[in-house]
């Protein structure tokens, strides 16, 4: 894991790690203060202390929001920030096109899956806005799975090894 400097791209070692394993972990892409401020923003929207046009129309999914960047400048700033865009471009070999955001108010347990099943030719970036522990929603990755075939829903319902 690596602490991030402002607007830094990936090192050659990080690029090689990504090519081999299909992921790279960067720490402190955003500061704890930036993350906590956004968490507070989201809590205030959810409990009605703060108003944002269109928020109610898109927040009826229980514990998460979808595509908030379309109507919330703060979410858009995170999505297109150079500290996120540069490492993505280094992994992809070209500038990334941001297409989707999701914010989870609490743990977001999901069964094993590949995001590319839902969004072909995509790369995902996960920003943990709070400290992650073994009990509050860690992200599990399978090194090298990017070189295997795409997992289908039928595969997930049975024992499956990449």
Model-derived features with residue positions:
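Non-heme Fe(II)-dependent double-stranded beta-helix
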Residues: 1-21, 27-119
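Conserved hydrophobic/aromatic beta-strand scaffold that supports enzyme active sites
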Residues: 7, 23-25, 124-128, 138-141
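Double-stranded beta-helix
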Residues: 16, 49, 134-162
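Short loop segments at secondary-structure junctions
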Residues: 28-30, 129-133, 144-146
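Short, charged/polar surface micro-motifs in flexible loops or helix N-caps
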Residues: 84, 94, 131-135, 147
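Short, structured patches in soluble enzyme cores that scaffold and shape functional sites
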Residues: 102-103, 114, 127-131, 143
């Amino acid at each position: 894991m690596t602490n991030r400097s402002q607007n830094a791209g990936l090192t050659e070692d990080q690029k090689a790690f990504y090519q081999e394993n299909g992921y790279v972990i960067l720490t402190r892409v955003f500061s704890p203060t930036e993350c906590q401020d956004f968490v507070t923003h989201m809590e205030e929207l959810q409990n009605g202390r703060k108003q944002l046009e269109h928020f109610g129309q898109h927040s009826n999914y229980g514990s998460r929001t979808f595509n908030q960047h379309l109507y919330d400048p703060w979410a858009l700033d995170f999505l297109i920030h150079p500290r996120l865009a540069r490492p993505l471009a280094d992994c992809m070999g070209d500038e990334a096109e941001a297409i989707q955001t999701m914010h989870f108010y609490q743990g977001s347990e999901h069964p094993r899956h590949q995001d590319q099943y839902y969004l072909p030719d995509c790369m995902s970036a996960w920003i943990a806005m709070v400290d992650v522990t073994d009990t509050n929603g860690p992200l599990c990755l399978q090194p090298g799975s990017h070189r295997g075939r795409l997992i289908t829903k039928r595969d997930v319902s049975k024992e499956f090894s990449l």
